[in-house]
Swiss-Prot record:
It is a multi-pass membrane protein. Its cofactor is Mg(2+). Requires a divalent cation activator, and is inhibited by CMP. Activated by phospholipids, especially phosphatidylcholine. Belongs to the CDP-alcohol phosphatidyltransferase class-I family. InterPro entries: CDP-OH_P_trans, CDP-OH_PTrfase_TM_dom, CDP_ALCOHOL_P_TRANSF_CS, CHOPT. Its EC number is 2.7.8.1, 2.7.8.2. The chain crosses the membrane at residues 50-69, 173-193, 212-232, 265-282, 286-308, 322-342, 347-367. The keyword Metal-binding does not apply. Residues 70-172, 233-264, 309-321, 368-391 are cytoplasmic. It is found in: Golgi apparatus membrane. One of its GO terms (biological process) is phosphatidylcholine biosynthetic process. This is Choline/ethanolaminephosphotransferase 1. It comes from Saccharomyces cerevisiae (strain ATCC 204508 / S288c) (Baker's yeast). The gene is EPT1. It catalyses: CDP-ethanolamine + a 1,2-diacyl-sn-glycerol = a 1,2-diacyl-sn-glycero-3-phosphoethanolamine + CMP + H(+); CDP-choline + a 1,2-diacyl-sn-glycerol = a 1,2-diacyl-sn-glycero-3-phosphocholine + CMP + H(+); CDP-N-methylethanolamine + a 1,2-diacyl-sn-glycerol = a 1,2-diacyl-sn-glycero-3-phospho-N-methylethanolamine + CMP + H(+); CDP-N,N-dimethylethanolamine + a 1,2-diacyl-sn-glycerol = a 1,2-diacyl-sn-glycero-3-phospho-N,N-dimethylethanolamine + CMP + H(+).
Length: 391
């Protein structure tokens, strides 16, 4: 077997059972009925993973459009681009919702589909940030890093929660449902009125000592995002604690040990982001396309490993080598700058792209290995349906 799935755990794929709890009224009364009808445009011979990839293609097209018209993420673009982004994001959500419906419709649900779906979502968590950054005109700034942190943290928390509870929870207000719809509406409004009106309208002033702070609409959005992130974290912890408390096989002291052990699974992620914060504080010019993508692929790899460990019933993956990249970049930056006297901008350029190459390479290796192992053991194809499965 492969590096990421030992022989003793691959057989656990046979006991796979998807469980979810969706409390969203929007999803229940509007989106799910819409997806049930929309999925009939896909022929029964089409593999569900093709639908997932097709939806992701809309985001890729959006991002390519962003960097064609706004490579620095801080200028106005033609109004039609915002409408195209809204359409692309909505179609991504639609295809993402339909892949599971289609899989159940043709009896092709399985662990490979869940891995594929969540892995694409993890990459999209970073790519969609570029759309938001261009929409608001924030550029390659600390705000961009904070936006990515919020997206990846929410995704990591959700995956961590599912690992422990074996259930995917979507609350009354969640990012994959209401969050995406709000993004679509904001893109349409930006296309109509322009980013200055929607995102940078002055609202009020806050005085802190001798400092006067002007608050605009984007500041309010960031405040709401922070509030949502905190609520999501509390909800995830509450669901994990509840799961272990309700475990009939656990005594009180064992339950506390399990809860404490679960919390430790959050430490690697926040330690990783602490190293990122130190790096960009030390040298803000690291905030570049290559660096953002490096962080995104590292996050996707880490989440992917948690999903695989959940599906194959392995221990929680506490160590992930790509998470050491920012620390290595800090050390190499200091060495190159202090000992060898290399220009700062050259060091940043080289280290940013080196980090991107390493994170991308590891993620490709991981996905290739996992897809191979899953398809071999389950006797399925990744992007098509075996003829024996169609009969």
């Amino acid at each position: 077997m492969g590096y990421f799935v030992p022989d003793s755990h691959i057989e656990n794929l046979k006991s796979y059972k998807y469980q979810s709890e969706d409390r969203s009224l929007v999803s229940k009364y509007f989106l799910k009925p819409f997806w049930q009808r929309f999925c009939h445009i896909f022929p029964t011979w089409m593999a569900p993973n093709i639908i997932t990839l097709s939806g992701f293609a809309f985001i890729v097209i959006n991002v390519l459009t962003v960097f064609y018209y706004d490579p620095n993420l801080n200028t106005d673009t033609p109004r039609w681009t915002y409408f195209s982004y809204a359409l692309g994001v909505f179609l991504y959500q639609t295809f993402d919702g339909c892949d599971g419906v289609h899989a159940r419709r043709i009896n092709q649900s399985g662990p490979l589909g869940e891995l594929f779906d969540h892995s694409i979502d993890a990459i999209n968590s970073t790519l969609s940030i570029f759309i938001f950054a261009s929409e608001t005109g924030m550029g390659f700034s600390y705000n961009l890093m904070l936006s990515q942190f919020a997206m990846l943290t929410n995704f990591y928390l959700s995956t961590w929660e599912e690992y422990h509870t074996h259930t995917l929870y979507l609350s009354e207000f969640s990012g994959p449902v209401e969050g995406i719809l709000i993004v679509c509406v904001s893109l349409i409004l930006t296309g109509i009125y322009g980013k200055q009106v929607i995102w940078h309208t002055y609202l009020f002033t806050i005085t802190v000592g001798d400092k006067v702070i002007d608050v605009d609409t984007l500041d309010i959005v960031f405040s709401l995002a922070v509030f949502g992130l905190v609520m999501n974290a509390l909800s995830a912890k509450r669901n994990v604690d509840k799961y272990y408390r309700n475990s009939t096989s656990s005594a009180n002291n064992i339950t506390q040990i399990e809860q404490d052990s679960a919390i430790k699974g959050l430490l690697p992620f926040f330690a990783y982001y602490a190293s990122i914060a130190l790096l960009v504080w030390m040298q803000p010019s690291f905030i570049t396309l290559s660096f953002i993508l490096s962080v995104g692929f590292t996050g996707a790899f880490t989440v992917g490993r948690i999903i695989v460990c959940h599906l194959t019933k392995q221990s929680f993956p506490m160590f992930n080598a790509p998470m050491l990249i920012p620390l290595c970049q800090i050390v190499l930056y200091k060495i190159c700058l202090s000992l060898w006297g290399i220009e700062s901008n050259k060091i940043v350029f080289a280290l940013s792209w080196l980090g991107f190459g390493l994170s991308l390479g590891v993620h490709i290796m991981f996905m290739n290995d996992i897809i191979h192992e899953f398809t071999e053991y389950l006797d399925v194809y990744a992007l098509s349906i075996k003829r024996s499965k169609l009969t």
